[in-house]
Amino acid sequence: MLLIEEKYRSVAQVLLSSGTCSRCVLRFCCVGSPANYRLPCKEVTYELQKYLSHGDPAEENDTPPSKKAKIEEDTSSNEHLGNCEDVNGSQVVRICPLCLGILQQFCEPEFIEKVFVKINSAVYELKDFVLSISLPAQLSVREHSAWLQAKQEMGKHGHSLDKTDIVQLKEAYKWIIHPLLSDQLGIQADSKSLFEVAVVFTHPETDGDCHFLATVCRDCFKPTKNKQSVFTRMAVVKALEKIKEEDFRVQFPFPPSSPETTCEVVDIQCNHSPVFVAGRYNKYSRNLPQTPWIIDGERKIESSVEELITDHLVAAFRSSSFNFSSSGREDVDVRTLGKGRPFAIELLNPHKVQFTGQEIKALQQKINTSDKIKVRDLQIVSREAVAHMKEGEEEKTKCYCALIWIEKMVRNEDLQLLDGLEELTIAQKTPLRVLHRRPLASRSRTIHTMRTEYVDEHHFRLYLKTQAGTYIKEFVHGDFGRTKPNVGSIMETNADILELDVESVDVDWPPSLDD
């Protein structure tokens, strides 16, 4: 039994006479009960017929009609009410001009099975799902036309009809689809689910419905590089908000043209929200870049820190791809020691997402079979937690150990001079070695502390604590005067760096784990 208020009677009559399907009639009559939309199309049609013929069905106490009674209904009424009738029968089904068949053809078991097969074949680990629908932009134009007509009908009887009162097509469709798909998958629909099933509809036959808006509201339709069409749903909705009602009626009168074809499903996409894995890595090789070193398509070094970590994670989470980020980076010939450098990996579209602490620890052990890197504190974290790694980037400190050569003999007083320097401010221009990939800039950096250790007459070790972002190699040799002051200028000699180790990255993230 449909619960339609009496004030919507004329709206229902006008829409039905225009060939609108019974479920779209419910939408424009502001029926907000999902159960009504889930009824078979034939039953909705019958109830609407009874409503228009005999009065408000809420006042009727009849039992549901038999199949024979339905068949014997007045055939003249069925010409208007039969949009959803007997899809497999001899009767020609009229395609709804408002939903373009979405609430007719695409709520049937055959389509549900098609979606189920798509999800099942992707082999995701699921606990719930959310359905998203992408609709052709021209549906907004057709709905606007129907709303103006419905509002006019309501106005004749002293009633108003706001556009927001109408049940949105997406909402009605989900009311019907969710329980059917839930039954097939054996899991519940949840609007907050991390697993999304996206159904993309198009309707080439009516693509031209939107075109008149471009002449009326030109500022709404500006071409962009990444969009194939300027007639996006957002642009169309914006134009519909601007256009005057009388201008719209002239350009797009009611009822909209009856389509000869239903919408097409061009894609059914499955996607799981990213999972973030964080940890710290040590790098022990002086011939290993942080990320793949590929120039003009040619790999320069066999592997990288990124690959040695992510290869295992991508395989375990069965993700489609990933994004690697870290708290700074070291050069290919620089080691990272101590507790390591914090990193985070965004695993995109993972198919497996449930891991125990022991399974993550086993993954860490697998990564650590490499003799080039080691990982610690490996853990799954939230997207929000990853932001902590980048917070206060300029205020972070890092500690280094550098093996330095100088041209003149190492004197004790020279080492003491360096030992006594604290909070030394230096000016650094973008180093020549990275100028090809970074813009020219001049920046101020602070060397907080320095401590020296004599090695031999031309070598010593320099232990530094610096502001993050300091170029240590350039601070030693001066980069042809682009870093001032530098170790060479302070000691009044030529200086160069032979080895560099990162001893600590002072970021209290991710949380330490008991390994």
UniProtKB/Swiss-Prot annotation:
Keyword entries, A-Z: Coiled coil, Cytoplasm, Isomerase, Metal-binding, Mitochondrion, Nucleus, tRNA processing, Zinc
- Region RNA binding thumb loop, as annotated, extends over 428-443
Task: Report which residue ranges the record marks as coiled coil.
Answer: 42-85
Region described as Disordered: 55-82
Question: InterPro entries recorded for this chain?
Answer: PsdUridine_synth_cat_dom_sf, Pus10-like, Pus10-like_C, Pus10_N_euk
Q: Gene3D superfamilies of this UniProt entry?
A: 1.10.10.2050, 3.30.70.2510, 3.30.70.3190
- Recorded GO terms, molecular function? metal ion binding; primary miRNA binding; pseudouridine synthase activity; tRNA pseudouridine synthase activity; tRNA pseudouridine(55) synthase activity
What general EC class does the enzyme of this chain belong to?
isomerase
GO cellular component: a single term: cytoplasm
Give the start-end ranges of region RNA binding forefinger loop: 291-304
Q: Which reaction does it catalyse?
A: uridine(55) in tRNA = pseudouridine(55) in tRNA; uridine(54) in tRNA = pseudouridine(54) in tRNA
**Pfam families linked:** Pus10_C (PF21238), Pus10_N_euk (PF21237)
Stated EC number for the protein is 5.4.99.25
Q: Which SUPFAM superfamilies match?
A: Pseudouridine synthase
A single Gene Ontology biological process assigned to it is: tRNA pseudouridine synthesis
Localization, per the record, is: Nucleus; Cytoplasm; Mitochondrion
Question: Member of which family?
Answer: Belongs to the pseudouridine synthase Pus10 family.
Which PANTHER family would you find in this protein's record?
Answer: TRNA PSEUDOURIDINE SYNTHASE PUS10
Q: What task does this protein carry out?
A: Protein with different functions depending on its subcellular location: involved in miRNA processing in the nucleus and acts as a tRNA pseudouridylate synthase in the cytoplasm. In the cytoplasm, acts as a pseudouridylate synthase by catalyzing synthesis of pseudouridine(54) and pseudouridine(55) from uracil-54 and uracil-55, respectively, in the psi GC loop of a subset of tRNAs. tRNA pseudouridylate synthase activity is enhanced by the presence of 1-methyladenosine at position 53-61 of tRNAs. Does not show tRNA pseudouridylate synthase activity in the nucleus.
Protein name in UniProt:
tRNA pseudouridine synthase Pus10
Q: Which gene encodes it?
A: pus10
